[in-house]
Amino acid sequence: MKHAGPEALDALAHLVAALRARGLKEPRPGIFYRKGKAWLHFHEDKAGLFADLRLGSEWERFRVSDAAGQANLLKLIDRSLARAAR
């Protein structure tokens, strides 16, 4: 499974825009950092588009090929950001 290229990121444009709106650092397209560490990035594969999100010390993979998967990822991200803000 390879990192998402420009075409894959174009397919995720609304999701990526929502992440940027949350103020996450994006040193390279589609790769987001939090507290100086890689926190979220995307992959593309024959099976679809996926996001790897660091929850705690482990990476977890989420399918983001459709609107439901993208909404689920944003909920997880919002919860994580809210916990960190406390």
Task: Go through each PLM region and give its residues.
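Charge-dense, helix-prone N-terminal extensions
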Residues: M1-R86
